[in-house]
Each structure stands twice: as structure tokens, then as C-alpha cells.
């Protein structure tokens, strides 16, 4: 439990000259225990905790429940190989459902425990109205998001339980295969068209998410999976943390044709701060300037319209520009966007307005 002095300091309204930011993706629930950090204390490692969120105007976002493979089985560092033009990461093997369920419940419990111990400074939100209320009152709005659905069996029983616990967003896969779909492998340069699409169980999962009002996230799906989801849902298509393949030809980014489909559905792309998905050379270089983020925002705004662009930082899950640093550096990005000519109303849409619209249309209310 955080002390009284800590909570008093966190309750102060920050003098951030920009609208509060709702962010499409972070991995804080994974990194907090791995780095022995408290969400209530300003850390020297990682990107996101409550003090840094307040300082940077981070008003909330999708908090990923992600289960990594055991390191003895697979690690990204060991799986990566470099080519003359870029890199390729050997796909992670499938994850055992029993392990995934235990780890998923642990991470979901961690988020609910943070909510309880925050004494009203963070809320696990279940409706768009709750998100909007939190942003207006300065309460951090946390959406429980499942990144890879290995914890859910093909009968989908676990989905109902997780929904009751607060789950409102789900990516059928991370970048590995499971019973529902095939994740896009990490490769540069490369096409996201890397294999088959949704399985029959995956199609059932998407339909059930539609019935419940759970947002389906497309960011780690391969291209055929993307189009399968597009053909199954009337909801806005959302890629919570992806960029433009035309600017950075990594497999994790979206082609122009995919971007057009997101636009036509009324959906949204959350611009990812991961430098390897920003740079035209795909290098994982923390010295990458913040202007690489604005470059993708500019391209997406021109291609799909500003109403379909948001932010999807990947805080605590990727190398981001050193100039940005962590969540406390978000005003530097907003200032860079203002210098690019974005108006106050456009900055509000980028910061949270577009996300709010999509959440209303997907969840109702």
C-alpha cells in the first residue's frame, strides 16, 4: 500500500499544457515484477508508473496481460538473427494453455490489486463513459487487455470469466501461433502476409468478442488473419500499436491496403513508439529522434485521415526514443506534433478523442 505522502503527491494536478493521453498499449504489468518496481513509486527503470504518468499527462490506456515463453524455451535475444538488410526472429513455440491461464490470472490480479491500492487514483474501466470520466477527473483509466489468447480454450469458457473480471480488449495472438490464429513473426524487411489466417476456433472467438463487446486488436495478427477479422465484424478495426509499412517495412506494420480497411471501418491505428517499427532501416536505436514518430503520424493522417490515428506507445515493451525517455516525456512528443502544425483540436483527437470514439462504438455507452 502506498503511503499517505505518496498518494498526496500523486493527487496533485500536473501542469501539462496538452490534453490527457489515452494510450493503446503498455507492458507495465509484465515489467513491474520483473524489475521489482512499484507502480506507485517513480522508477529509474522502465517507462511507466503512476508518478511518471501524472507528470507526462498519461491519462490511461490498454494495460496488456501478456505471457512470455519461459526463457529456457525461447527468448527474443537468442532467437534474433541479423541479415545484410535487417533482422529476423525465429518464431516462439506455442505456449501451454495451463501455464498461460495461471500467468494471465496473476497479471489480471496485479492490475486489480493496483486499482485497490491506488485509493482512487487508478480505475479499471469497463465502459467508454468510465474512460471519459477518468480523463476528466484526472484518474488513470486502465483497460484490461489480453495480448495473445492462450489462456482461453477453444470452448471460450475462460473468456466469459475474464470479461466479468474486466477484460475489454483482446488480441487473438502475440507474434506466435495458437489455437486461434497465427501471429506475424518479427522480420525486417518483410511482408505481414506470412501464413494462414484465423482457425475455426479463432473465428468463433472473434464472434464471441463481438457479442460481449470486447475490442479485437489486430496488431500482432498476420495479414490473412487481419482480413479474416475484417470479414467477421462490423466493429471498427483497431491496431493498437502498429505503424505504416510504407515508411518502415517491418512485418509488424500495416500495409496501405490494411490502413485503408481500418479507415473504411471507422477504426484506428495507435502509433507505436518502438524505434524498430519507426525507422526506414529498422534499427533498434534509442538515438532515434521523436520526429520519427511524428513522421508516421503525418503519413497516417494523410492516408486514412486524422480521425483514425491515435497513440500506442508500447511503453515497457520496446526500445523507444531516448529523447522521449518514458511516460513523463509525452509532452515532448505533443510539442513536436504542435510544431508540425497540428491544431489544439487535432491534438485532442490524437491524444484521446479518437480512442474514445472507437471505444464507444465497440463497447457501447
Predicted ranges, named:
Residues 2-192, 249-311, 315-365:
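N-terminal hydrophobic targeting/anchoring segments and the immediately downstream early-domain regions
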Residues 151-153, 162-252:
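Divalent metal-binding pocket/active-site signature
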Amino acid at each position: 500500500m502506498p503511503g499517505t505522502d505518496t498518494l498526496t503527491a500523486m493527487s496533485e494536478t500536473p501542469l501539462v499544457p496538452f490534453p490527457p493521453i489515452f494510450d493503446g498499449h503498455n507492458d507495465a504489468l509484465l515489467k513491474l515484477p520483473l524489475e521489482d518496481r512499484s507502480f506507485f513509486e517513480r522508477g529509474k527503470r522502465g517507462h511507466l508508473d503512476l508518478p511518471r504518468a501524472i507528470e507526462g499527462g498519461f491519462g490511461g490506456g490498454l494495460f496488456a496481460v501478456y505471457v512470455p515463453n519461459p526463457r529456457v524455451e525461447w527468448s527474443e535475444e537468442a532467437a534474433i538473427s541479423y541479415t545484410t538488410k535487417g533482422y529476423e526472429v525465429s518464431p516462439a513455440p506455442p505456449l501451454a494453455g495451463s501455464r498461460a491461464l495461471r500467468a494471465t490470472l496473476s497479471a489480471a490480479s496485479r492490475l486489480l490489486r493496483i486499482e485497490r491500492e491506488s485509493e482512487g487514483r487508478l480505475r479499471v474501466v469497463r465502459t467508454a463513459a468510465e474512460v471519459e470520466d477518468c480523463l476528466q477527473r484526472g484518474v488513470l483509466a486502465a483497460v484490461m487487455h489480453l495480448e495473445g489468447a492462450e489462456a482461453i480454450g477453444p470452448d471460450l469458457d475462460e473468456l466469459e470469466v475474464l470479461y466479468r473480471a474486466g477484460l475489454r480488449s483482446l488480441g487473438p495472438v502475440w507474434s506466435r501461433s495458437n489455437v486461434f490464429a497465427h501471429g506475424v513473426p518479427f522480420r525486417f524487411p518483410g511482408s505481414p502476409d506470412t501464413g494462414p489466417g484465423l482457425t475455426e476456433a479463432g473465428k468463433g472467438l472473434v464472434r464471441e468478442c463481438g457479442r460481449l463487446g470486447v475490442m479485437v486488436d489486430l496488431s500482432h495478427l498476420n495479414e490473412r488473419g487481419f482480413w479474416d477479422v475484417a470479414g467477421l465484424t462490423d466493429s471498427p478495426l483497431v491496431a493498437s500499436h502498429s505503424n505504416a509499412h510504407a515508411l518502415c517495412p517491418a512485418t509488424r506494420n500495416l500495409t496501405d491496403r490494411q490502413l485503408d480497411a481500418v479507415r473504411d471501418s471507422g477504426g484506428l491505428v495507435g502509433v507505436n513508439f518502438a524505434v524498430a517499427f519507426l525507422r526506414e532501416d529498422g534499427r533498434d536505436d534509442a538515438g532515434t529522434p521523436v520526429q520519427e514518430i511524428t513522421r508516421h503520424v503525418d503519413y497516417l493522417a494523410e492516408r486514412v485521415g486524422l480521425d483514425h490515428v491515435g497513440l500506442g506507445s508500447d511503453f515497457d515493451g520496446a526500445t523507444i526514443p531516448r529523447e522521449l525517455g518514458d511516460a513523463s516525456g509525452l509532452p515532448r512528443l505533443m510539442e513536436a506534433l504542435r510544431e508540425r502544425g497540428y491544431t489544439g483540436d487535432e491534438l485532442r483527437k490524437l491524444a484521446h478523442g479518437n480512442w474514445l470514439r472507437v471505444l464507444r462504438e465497440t463497447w457501447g455507452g
